[in-house]
Amino acid sequence: MVKYQYEFPLDKAGKAGAVKPYRGGKNDFVTPVSNLSGVAEILTNAALKATEAYSQLGQDRLGAVLISKVKGWAYADREGTLFIEESDNNNVWTTTAAVNVAAGVLTATDWVYLSKRYYRFRYVNGNLQQSEFVLYQSVGAGEMDVRVNEKTPLQIDFAENQTHDGRLKVEARKTFDFVFHENAESASEGAALPVDGAAHLLVEVYGTAEMSEVKFWGKSVSGQKLPIRGVKTDDATTASSTLGKAEAWAFDIKGFKEIIMEIISITGGTLSVKGTAVS
């Protein structure tokens, strides 16, 4: 078996974490127990104490390149359990997949397709302290989150959005900007955004007002105004209104006919509310 050496920079917590290994000629070398070079990257090689756990720093899969699936490998001289976990806010985590790792056996998870924004690998050691431990990850990018679990061949009728070889005809997402309020000095509903097939909306609230309140509304097919909740982008809190400024809010607007950002009150300056809708 070919063996490679890697240097592991430490993360800000002082422990080898979610960092890409690289070959170097300085110090802190380790030798992986399996030749996975070019297929996987090493997350950690630090041995764990009895019942100790390793948690990868939360990874945002919606970056410049979409990460659609992940796979993990673990090797240890003591048994343990490898988890793949997901989160919507990089705070509360749920287990998507888990595999028991026997002592002295390089063990892999299946490819796991991701559905939430953040993912991480977590390894929980058993009741005996390790002497050897190494954890790898592989990622798959740019794939659609579609899986078929049928064991028998499926009868397929090609739809209008498919080519004859079964490939999807993909349309690019459409985006458009919209101004709800521009330097408003008084309370008002402002302009209503026609949803027109848009699915997501990012709204910015900013201005010089000393005090203000903006309430978030969605109009249903009957014309009724319904409160909608947005997610504040800097801390992932949710609310149906805001008293702040210099903020950005994300909304799921599917099913509504119009979106309204109503200025309920304003004193001592102006306020602007603008958004970008994505189909």
Swiss-Prot record:
State the protein's name.
Phage-like element PBSX protein XepA
Transmembrane stretches in the record are none
Domain of life of the native organism: Bacteria
The family assignment reads: To B.subtilis YqxG/YqdC.
Task: State its role.
Answer: Not known; does not seem to be involved in host cell lysis.
Q: Which organism is it from?
A: Bacillus subtilis (strain 168)
